[in-house]
Amino acid sequence: MARPIVAVVGRPNVGKSTLFNKIAGERISIVENKPGVTRDRIYAEAEWLNYQFTLIDTGGIEPESEEIIPAQMRRQAELAMETANVIIFVVDGREGLTSVDRDVAELLRKTKKPVIVTLNKVDTRHQSEHFYEFYELGMGDPIEISASLGLGIGDLLDEVVKNFNPEDYNQYDDDVIKVAMIGKPNVGKSSLINRILGEERVIVSDIAGTTRDAIDTPFTDGDDRYVLIDTAGIRRKSRITESIEKYSIVRAIAAVEKSDVCLLVIDASEGVTEQDKKIAGYSHENGKGMVIVVNKWDIIEKDNHTMNEFIKEIRNELTYISYAPIVFVSALTGQRMNKILEEVKHVSNQNAMRIPTGALNEVIGEAILLNQAPSDKGKRLKVFYATQASVKPPTFILFINDKELMHFSYLRYLENKIRENFGFEGTPIRFILREKTGRD
């Protein structure tokens, strides 16, 4: 199930980033250190009362150039409208209600999404003298917090999770393959979608998604049911030059959250860009199936080695998604377009595949015989047995004697052996290490 998205919105200097960091806690550093993922602290994974959600810091989207504050706020509010399931509207409890706050509230009201008015910088147990001013906004009871001191955060998060509605982010049946078309602007995502939804497809209906210009389009291909989650509408916003890249990434986050399989579209004339790495990294982190689609292949001058050289470049630049199949296509000419849905279906099946425990342990045992487990100071790693815990992504529990003895390189070796024997093309694999003694 996709995680709900919570956006932190507010005019500059009301403490959005402080609140973001307080809610996200140490998770930010974990996200930052993973390969291919943005270091701009635009998003973080958070959890409260067993609810997992994605936190978006719209403060990180603000352009650096000197612009009129209401214009900046309009962009923030638009971003919240398009991506969030719940909006935290941060205001300054010391300063009171301002005209900019009123303008932002008016924009947020139009979203018809849950908005929680949050008075920050209330650093004492005494109520802000401006508390009742915020009832003028007509957005329910304000919540007082101090992000810097951590006061009231629990009450705020209680209110946030109360507003989660599973129907908002889990619209489709389990047998529908949800496909997100992701990638930086101007790589041909819209053209690819038009090709996929050609006359030979049966378009069921158009359902407005959680993003305003992204349309979720269900369709069938034979007996298979799909829904395409389109983020191509980001190109229409290209006038926001200062923040276009960050904006694109946030839009991709919303699409990835809803998807089973991501199509990472790369422009053949540009190769792999930094933004491609960031978007691919987010999909990988979230355990989504992945197909790399190299578009505009028709305009590339080729010889017998061109495709192999391009594959090598992609593998070198996107090492952490080496499992993803690569398809070279042209939306303009229709070249190899039939391969896309073939790979999507295959990857979706691989992402949901279960391996019998007996077969899994046989492969693990043979792998250990071929390449002895590491040791340290006379103590050798022992893998007692393995079992598959879940799918989407495939997740395996390894019961071992000592976690400290499991080197990253050896875990990668075991992963490669599992892939060699069972496949899992196009999907990340997760491992959970659990210690037990031989007597357990």
Swiss-Prot record:
GO annotation, biological process: ribosome biogenesis
Any one GO molecular-function label of the UniProt entry: ribosome binding
Domain EngA-type G residue range list: 4-168, 177-352
Binding locations of GTP 1: 10-17, 57-61, 120-123
Domain KH-like: residue ranges: 353-437
Keyword Cytoplasm recorded: no
Classification via CDD domains: EngA1, EngA2
Highest taxon above the source species: Bacteria
Binding site for GTP 2: 183-190, 230-234, 295-298
UniProt keyword annotations, A-Z: GTP-binding, Nucleotide-binding, Repeat, Ribosome biogenesis
InterPro entries the record matches: G_ENGA (IPR031166), GTP-bd (IPR006073), GTPase_Der (IPR016484), KH_dom-like (IPR032859), KH_dom-like_a/b (IPR015946), P-loop_NTPase (IPR027417), Small_GTP-bd (IPR005225)
Family listed: Belongs to the TRAFAC class TrmE-Era-EngA-EngB-Septin-like GTPase superfamily. EngA (Der) GTPase family.
Alphabetized HAMAP family for the sequence: GTPase_Der (MF_00195)
Matching NCBIfam families: GTPase_EngA, small_GTP
Subunit and interaction comment: Associates with the 50S ribosomal subunit.
PANTHER family referenced in this protein's UniProt entry, alphabetically: GTPASE DER
Reported function: GTPase that plays an essential role in the late steps of ribosome biogenesis.
Protein name per UniProt: GTPase Der
